[in-house]
Amino acid sequence: MSFLKNLFKKKSPTHELFHPLSRSPLTALRRRSEHIKQVYRCPISGKSVEYECPESGFPTHCNRTHWEQDKIHQSLIPKLRQINEDYHDLARPNPLPELLKLPGPMEEDEVVSLLSWDSFFYTRDFPKFQSSRTARHITSLLTYPMSIGAILHKNSPYNLKNGLTPQGLQSLTALRYMLHRPLSAQSTDPRPTRIFVLGATKECSLPPSIWLQGLNFLFPGRLFQLHFIGPEVVVPSKQPNLPSPLSLHFHQDYYHNLHRVGAFEPFDPYYDTFFLPMPLISHPLYSSSWIPTLHDLVSTRCSVWLTSPSSQRTTKDLEVLNNVLKDSIEPLLLPTVNKFASLGWSVDDSNLHEVYHANQEVFGFRALYYNVQNVSKE
């Protein structure tokens, strides 16, 4: 039995957590119900959704008859209901007391296992979770820093046997050379490791303590700069008071606009990397805005790591990458299941048939490197 299951106690009744979204006590969820009605159409008739599923609480169809006919939706009801209850659970007073008991920085000789959430929680001595719902809440936060942190760490679960390419190992060796130096060497290096989070939305609103868990605490003594970049980035009115090893920077603009004016020059593959959590590269409405950014990413010659909510989305994103960048890139990590995907379910408001775990898959690329060899003429 897994570590998480050993920790979970008997769950309390959850009936009080369920509310139809349109009648939710939470204003945000009532607004979400209205938003779904604006962007989603009945999958049977294509008409506006007016009927609210009595079992999941989501507005899903134009009438009850079509709700009964939709076999796909019927199979998704348990997941949608769990999403509903999890949202309402977070509205309770102090829903996650575990956040106040998170472990501190690792000692230099401490070893962490990154094979799974189970092994990570165990070796980092996380507090005991009260329920599987608590685990879903915690991992829905930690999935973002841990998705990139687990790639960069020397104990990464990704290797040459399960998707990491020789080029990927080369890029990570450069980054790890700086990340895992002795504390005495770290303290004399003023340059931070910079992680550029592109297309940032939820990531920029995470508590800084969550980013500390997935970055600074895994790499003792290392300095980090996080740059959240994208048109949906919310710039805080007051910058958080953070420990000096971590600094957060918010840029409410497209990356290619900032790249054009040299905002982050110079780049160094030993110090800099890019993280694109579930980018909408292949989405018809957003694909064109990503194209100039993709070209600029290649010009930095730094590693680029992406996550995806599903294998179908990964395939579509790779098609766009290959069509746009053609022969100018090489893979670093072949698409694989992300060991630190969220355990909680999420749903796309514009397609309630698309229920997924955030950051379900991970892959990576960089600019194509050419090996130059001297060939003597006979």
From Swiss-Prot:
This is Protein mss51. One of its GO terms (cellular component) is mitochondrial membrane. Belongs to the MSS51 family. It comes from Schizosaccharomyces pombe (strain 972 / ATCC 24843). Keywords: Membrane, Mitochondrion, Mitochondrion inner membrane, mRNA processing, mRNA splicing. GO terms for biological process: mitochondrial cytochrome c oxidase assembly; mRNA processing; RNA splicing. It is a peripheral membrane protein. Has a dual role in the assembly of cytochrome oxidase subunit 1 (cox1). It has a regulative function on cox1 synthesis, acting as a translational activator specific for the cox1 mRNA, and it also binds to newly synthesized cox1 protein. Its main location: mitochondrion. It is found in: Mitochondrion inner membrane. InterPro entries: Mss51-like_C, Mss51_Znf.
